[in-house]
C-alpha cells in the first residue's frame, strides 16, 4: 500500500499534527512492528501496567524471538529512569493513562530523558484518544492507537495506527519499510469503517466524559462508597 492510499494513517496523523501515519491490520500488529524498530537483544523501559495484549507481545513473543529485555517501572521520574537505564536501552514505552489506576505518567520526564539519551519514546494513546491527549505535542516520537474500540466506535473492526512525529525521518523510513515487508497493512475497506468512526469521535468522547464525570460525582457524594477513582475529581492524585 502506498502512503497516498493510507487515508486512515493520514487522518490520525493530521489529528495529532504528526509527520506521517500508518494504518495496520490490527492494534497488535502495530505494537509488534514498533518493537521491531530496535535491534535484537535491546532493552526497553516500560510502564508496569501495560495492556494485556502489549504485555504478551513483550514477554511471550519478543523476549523469546528477539531477545528483548524489559524493565517495568511504577513511575517515570528522572531518578527511576536513570536507575533502570542500561547501555543497550533503546526505547521507553508508556501509556497515556495507566491501567487500572488511570494515573497520568510524567510525560515531560519521559520525553526529556529519551531525548537526552537518544532513546525512542513511544506512547500508547488508545485509552485517551487524540481528543483527550496529544502525545506528539507532548514530545513523543511515536504514538500508537488500537483502533478497534474508541477510534472506530465499534468493536467489529480490527485496526491499528502509528503516527511518527516530525523530525524523525529515520524512524519513519524504517517503520514504513517494516510495514511493507511484513505485510501488516489495513485494507481500504477497513480504513473507511474506522474513518467513519473518527467523524464522530469528538462528540462520542465528550458525551462519555460528561456521563462518567456525573456518575463519579454522584458516587463520590455517597457516604456508603469507600472511594471513587476518576481523573475529573479533585480527590484524584493527578487532577489538574
Spans of features found by a protein language model:
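Conserved PLP-enzyme active-site core in the AAT-like
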Residues: 20-222, 229, 235
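Active-site loop ensemble at the mouth of alpha/beta enzyme cores that anchors a bound cofactor
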Residues: 234-240
Amino acid at each position: 500500500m502506498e502512503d497516498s492510499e493510507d487515508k486512515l494513517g493520514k487522518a490520525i496523523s493530521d489529528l495529532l499534527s504528526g509527520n506521517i501515519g500508518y494504518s495496520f491490520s490490527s492494534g497488535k500488529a502495530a505494537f509488534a512492528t514498533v518493537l521491531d524498530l530496535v535491534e535484537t537483544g535491546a532493552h526497553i523501559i516500560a510502564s508496569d501496567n501495560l495492556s494485556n495484549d502489549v504485555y504478551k507481545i513483550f514477554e511471550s513473543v519478543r523476549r523469546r524471538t528477539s531477545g528483548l529485555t524489559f524493565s517495568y517501572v511504577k513511575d517515570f521520574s528522572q531518578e527511576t529512569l536513570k536507575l533502570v537505564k542500561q547501555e543497550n536501552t533503546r526505547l521507553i514505552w508508556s501509556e497515556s493513562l495507566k491501567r487500572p489506576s488511570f494515573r497520568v505518567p510524567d510525560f515531560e520526564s519521559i520525553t526529556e530523558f529519551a531525548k537526552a539519551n537518544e532513546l525512542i519514546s513511544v506512547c500508547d494513546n488508545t485509552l485517551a484518544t487524540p481528543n483527550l491527549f496529544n502525545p506528539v505535542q507532548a514530545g513523543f516520537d511515536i504514538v500508537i492507537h488500537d483502533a478497534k474500540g474508541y477510534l472506530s466506535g465499534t468493536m467489529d473492526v480490527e485496526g491499528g495506527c502509528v503516527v511518527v512525529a516530525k523530525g524523525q525521518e529515520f524512524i519513519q523510513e524504517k517503520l514504513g519499510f517494516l510495514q511493507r515487508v511484513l505485510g501488516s497493512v489495513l485494507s481500504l475497506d477497513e480504513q473507511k469503517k474506522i474513518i467513519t468512526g473518527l467523524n464522530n469521535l469528538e462528540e462520542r468522547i465528550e458525551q462519555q466524559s460528561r456521563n462518567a464525570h456525573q456518575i463519579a460525582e454522584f458516587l463520590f457524594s455517597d457516604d456508603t462508597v469507600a472511594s471513587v477513582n476518576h481523573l475529573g475529581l479533585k480527590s484524584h492524585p493527578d487532577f489538574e
